[in-house]
Amino acid sequence: MNLQPTQQFFEHDGLRLSYWEWGDPREETYVFVHGVRDQGRSWDYFFEALLRRGVPIKHAVALDLRGHGDSEWPSSTRGYQHEDFLTDLAGLLKHLDKEPATIIGHSLGGSMCLLYAAAFPEKVKRLVLLESLGPFARADEEVPNIIAERLRGRDYVEIPFPHESLESAAKSLQKTFPLIPDEAALHMARHGTNFRGGRYRWKHDPILRYRTTTAMSEGQIEAFIRRLQCPILFVYGTESDFMKSVRGHRAQLFPNAKIVPVEGAGHHIPHEKPEELADIVTPFLMNGN
């Protein structure tokens, strides 16, 4: 298989969405969905690590969610609700006309994969969740602050292209996620930035720095989890606090889940520990359980 993916586009929900494709579209499909402020090429190192271990992936696609990568931005922050991101995944699978598929998601992408697998259990063969056990629930009293933050975000002042080099963009990523190695951060900068006038900026919509989704209730999320039917692998980083507050409670609700930590990894496991992650995910994909 050629390790350089081909970029494809499709029209969905009034937006032109991008995805990256490897292999033969006539074969069984594996779908990769990134997290917030990330993009489809974030899977490159992990995907290559899976192939080196003999995982028989002959067709794979990695979606750029709306507002990320080379996908278009919606005209309003209301276009970044859970249902909006979920419809991107549903639209891609409808466009590919391939089911059931194995779907692999990180963070926000994992939440969308979970919701999709619960809504359409017959369309998902296997589910891999990286640093995600579904969307965050918020207490009722938090929702007004989330709405206010989203409204304030409309008035953000953005330096159009703040980075003088790819290395500068990579360092900005590592300030937030210091466990991402230099090589991986630079790879993300190469594929995740736009260049204009001698300077760089990350491709994602700047509004995504704010909480743009109005949270679901814990009861609603648990109802989705109870509908899951396929084999599930949940992987988390031992150095990550993401989802830590609900990890124990939510994990008990999953009917068919295997839960495995990656030692020394933070939130961005595919960037930080692609080889170790592939060691964990490979037997699940090879055996289906």
Model-assigned labels for residue ranges:
Residues 12-15, 51, 55-104, 108, ...:
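Active-site loop/oxyanion-hole signature of alpha/beta-hydrolase fold enzymes
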Residues 18-73, 250:
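Conserved HGGG/HGGXW glycine-rich cap/lid loop of the alpha/beta-hydrolase fold
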Residues 99-143:
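Conserved hydrolase catalytic core segment
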Residues 130-133, 137-162:
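A catalytic-pocket lid/entrance helix-loop region that shapes and gates access to the active site
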Residues 159-219:
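Conserved alpha/beta-hydrolase catalytic His-Asp/Glu region
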Residues 195-252:
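Conserved serine/cysteine hydrolase catalytic core
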Residues 265-274, 278:
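Catalytic histidine-centered segment of alpha/beta-hydrolase-like enzymes
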